[in-house]
Amino acid sequence: MSEKHPGPLVVEGKLTDAERMKLESNYLRGTIAEDLNDGLTGGFKGDNFLLIRFHGMYQQDDRDIRAERAEQKLEPRHAMLLRCRLPGGVITTKQWQAIDKFAGENTIYGSIRLTNRQTFQFHGILKKNVKPVHQMLHSVGLDALATANDMNRNVLCTSNPYESQLHAEAYEWAKKISEHLLPRTRAYAEIWLDQEKVATTDEEPILGQTYLPRKFKTTVVIPPQNDIDLHANDMNFVAIAENGKLVGFNLLVGGGLSIEHGNKKTYARTASEFGYLPLEHTLAVAEAVVTTQRDWGNRTDRKNAKTKYTLERVGVETFKAEVERRAGIKFEPIRPYEFTGRGDRIGWVKGIDDNWHLTLFIENGRILDYPGRPLKTGLLEIAKIHKGDFRITANQNLIIAGVPESEKAKIEKIAKESGLMNAVTPQRENSMACVSFPTCPLAMAEAERFLPSFIDKIDNLMAKHGVSDEHIVMRVTGCPNGCGRAMLAEVGLVGKAPGRYNLHLGGNRIGTRIPRMYKENITEPEILASLDELIGRWAKEREAGEGFGDFTVRAGIIRPVLDPARDLWD
C-alpha cells in the first residue's frame, strides 16, 4: 500500500468477536458485578475476562506453578494485574503511601511495579481484593479507567515537569488530553465505587458504543528529550516553545511497535509528521485523530487494527486531511525540533525555581524490599517527609521532585541507606525490560528476571573493549507485542521461546529508527558471542561520538529500516 495506491477507508468483512463483546457489554458493564460474587473461581468468566481490561485490569496466573496446579487438578492461580491512570507519571506522596500499603497487604507479590508508560502496576491481586483496590485508588483521587484495551491509554509526558515553565504547561496538557478522551460510561463508578445507576442513557460521543478498534497511545514530548519514546505511540504532541513558553505542538501520528512473529502483515512503524498546531486547537485535534481512527480502523482483524495500519492503508495525506476536516483547522508546516537523548539523568538536578529533583534508578521498575536494599521501605520513608511529589519516568525510574535545599541531605540519607542511590554503570541505566514471566500470559521468554544478570555480562564486554563509560540502548521484551520497546532500541531482544530471542540491531540512541532482525531464535551465549564481536568493532572503528546503533548501520553490519511497512521483514 502506498500514497499512490491507497486502500479503502473502511475495511468490510466479518467483525472480530471483540467487537461483538463490546457492543453487547452495555457500555462496559457486562456481568462483572455478578461475577465478583462468584467464589467458585478465582477468575472472571466469558466476556468479563476481557471487559475488566477496560477497567484497568488483566487476568493473569502464576506461570511458574501452572503445570503443578494442573497436575493437582486445580485451576490456575488467577490474580489480576491493575494499572493506574496517572497522566505524566505524577503521584503525590499521600497517594504513594496508600499504594505502598495496598501492595504490601493485599497483593501476592508485595511489590509496586513502575512501568515504561509512566504509571504503576500491582501484580497478584486476588479476586476478593479487586473491588477494594479500586476503592482505595478512588479514596486518594486515582483510578484505573481506560489504562488497558481499546481506549486512549495513560498519556505520557516528558519527566521533570517542574524543571521549567514549559514542563509545567506540557504536563497540564497531558492531563487535559487524558480527561478529554476518557470514556463517559458510568460503568466504572457503578461497579467499583457503588455509585447508583442513573436513569440516563449512556453515550460515548468520542469513543462510540464499540470504543476504538484497538489500543491507542498518546504522548506529550518536550525536545530535546525523547524519554517517552514518541515513535512507539499513536498520537504525539511535540512541544514547541518561543522564549521558554509553550505556543503549540507538532503532531506526529501512527507510531507503534507490536508485531507478530512471522506475520509479515505486522510491522513496527515510526510516527508520521502531520504538521504544527497552535495550543488552542489541541483538544479538537486530539479528538479528530481518535475519531478518525475509530471510524476507519480495521475492526475485522485485531492484528491489523492499530492506527499505524490505518495510515498505511488509506495514506498519510488522506488521514491527515480528514483530521483537518474534523478539527476545522489546517496544519501549519512542522516547526523545527530535534532530539538528543532519551535516558534519565540519574541523581540530583537543580530546577529553575531553585528546588532540586532526585532521579532514582530503579532496575526494571520493581519496587520491593530486597536483602540489604529495602527500596520499598526507603521510598515510604521519603514519602512521609517529602513536601513535593513523585514522578514516574518512561524509563521505569522515579523522580523525587521539588526538594528544597534544606531537605536535600535528609532525603539523600534515606535514599542511600535504602540502596536507592547505589552506583550502577551507564549501560545498566540505559537497559530496560518488560515484566514477562511469571505473570504475563503472553510471555515467550524471560525479560525482567533475565535482564540483571544479562547486563552483568554486557558490562564485562564493555569493560573488555574499553567502553565502560559508554552505553548502548538495550532492551528486552518477552514477546513480540513489545512492551519493553525493544523495537526502538540499539540492541533489542524479542522473546521467541524459553531461553531464545530474536536479536535486532540498527536502532539509534534517540529512538527514531526501528532496528532490523540480525539473528533469529538464538540463545544467550549466542547473543553474547555476537555482541562481543560487534562491541569490539564499535570500540575500534567508530567515529567520534558515534553510537552503537548508528555504527552498525554505517559499517554495513545491518541494513537500516527506512520504510518499515515495506522493508522491515526483508
From Swiss-Prot:
Keyword NADP applies: yes
Q: Which GO terms describe its molecular function?
A: 4 iron, 4 sulfur cluster binding; heme binding; metal ion binding; NADP binding; sulfite reductase (ferredoxin) activity; sulfite reductase (NADPH) activity
Q: Which cofactor does it need?
A: siroheme; [4Fe-4S] cluster
Protein name (database record): Sulfite reductase [NADPH] hemoprotein beta-component
How is the quaternary structure described? Alpha(8)-beta(8). The alpha component is a flavoprotein, the beta component is a hemoprotein.
Q: In which pathway does it act?
A: Sulfur metabolism; hydrogen sulfide biosynthesis; hydrogen sulfide from sulfite (NADPH route): step 1/1
Q: Member of which family?
A: Belongs to the nitrite and sulfite reductase 4Fe-4S domain family.
Residues binding [4Fe-4S] cluster are: 434, 440, 479, 483
Q: What does this protein do?
A: Component of the sulfite reductase complex that catalyzes the 6-electron reduction of sulfite to sulfide. This is one of several activities required for the biosynthesis of L-cysteine from sulfate.
The answer to whether the entry has keyword Iron-sulfur is yes
Catalysed transformations (reactions): hydrogen sulfide + 3 NADP(+) + 3 H2O = sulfite + 3 NADPH + 4 H(+)
Q: What is its EC number?
A: 1.8.1.2
Q: Which UniProt keywords apply?
A: 4Fe-4S, Amino-acid biosynthesis, Cysteine biosynthesis, Heme, Iron, Iron-sulfur, Metal-binding, NADP, Oxidoreductase
Q: Which GO terms describe its biological process?
A: cysteine biosynthetic process; hydrogen sulfide biosynthetic process; sulfate assimilation
* Record GO cellular component, one term: sulfite reductase complex (NADPH)
Gene behind this chain? Answer: cysI
Cofactor stoichiometry and binding remark: Binds 1 siroheme per subunit.
On the tree of life, the source organism's domain of life is Bacteria
Which residues make up the binding site for siroheme? 483
Q: Which organism is this protein's natural source?
A: Escherichia coli (strain SMS-3-5 / SECEC)
Q: What class of enzyme is it?
A: oxidoreductase
Q: Which Pfam families match?
A: NIR_SIR, NIR_SIR_ferr
